Amino acid sequence: MVKQRVKAIVSDYDGTLVPTAHVKNTNAIPTELEEILSNISAEIPVSIISSKDFEFLLKKVTFSRILSCIMGIETVVLTTHAISPIVEKRIFRADPAALQMNSKVLEAIAEEVTSHREFSGLLVEHKHTSDGILAGLTVDWRHHLIDDWSYYKGAINNLINRMVANLKKPPVPIDVYVQKYSSHPFVDIYSADCNKGMAFETVISELRNISADYKGVLYLGDSENDNPAFRKAGISIGIRSDPRLKPRLDCSYFLDYEQLTSFLMKLRNNGYLFSDELLLEAMA
């Protein structure tokens, strides 16, 4: 039986702490789950790694001191304050000048997508750094009927593939990073190469008393973009929040979304000693 003391929790946001079925502006963490996360964060670090941007996350995860935003392009370390959190440090995994230049490319991609009548009903989410640079886009069709998902996935991916191929042509080739998913109903485009493995390393580097092998770190996620972080964490748990989705996850364990709060409560009550038995109790 695996037994491991959890010294820090790192979690994805969308689809993990909030079900994927929820769209932007309605996806707040349920009260009971937020309460246990807040209680845990007073005892061990709870950090977030997300494709969402800083402005979005700051309002949603008040229990987290470290927010790795836009797939790790920007990581913000906060200091607690009686009234509101204050930014202590910003860490960029890309050159700010390159981000500024590529932001215009992302704007052009967004305009191209929205100019097509067949995509007029899709959501295009713009993701900005804390100083206002556009660094990511998500084209999202989760609110459409599942019968239409495969059509939008194929059509959007074809359009983006053509645009990215054109961007790579001389005389001035431009690279953007595209994150695709096997079953999730959206696609992400970023202005710099990024992944949650790099974001994970950045977050852990800001924490104390974490061993170099990351054994004491528990990571929670729900999609393929979490795989690089799953592979680094000592304990990796995939969260199943939407029965329509069948992502290929490189995690050691799984929990249904409805079991997550119970698991975290049991983990805290057990002094943060993780075991297979504890997980099974939460699943019962």
Label for each model-derived stretch:
Residues 2-11, 31-44, 166, 215:
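A short, Lys/Arg-enriched amphipathic alpha-helix followed by its capping loop at the start of a domain
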Residues 4, 190-284:
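Mg2+-dependent phosphoryl-transfer enzymes with acidic/Ser/Thr/Gly-rich catalytic loops
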Residues 5-23, 200, 230:
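Asp-based phosphoryl-transfer active-site loop
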Residues 6, 43-44, 64, 71, ...:
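Short, well-ordered alpha-helix to beta-strand connector turns
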Residues 11, 48-52, 220-222:
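Short His-Asn-centered micro-motif
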Residues 17-25, 184-191:
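Glycine-rich phosphate-binding "P-loop"
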Residues 20, 27-126:
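Active-site phosphate-binding/coordination module
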Residues 112-218, 224-232:
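Conserved acidic, metal-coordinating active-site core of Asp-based
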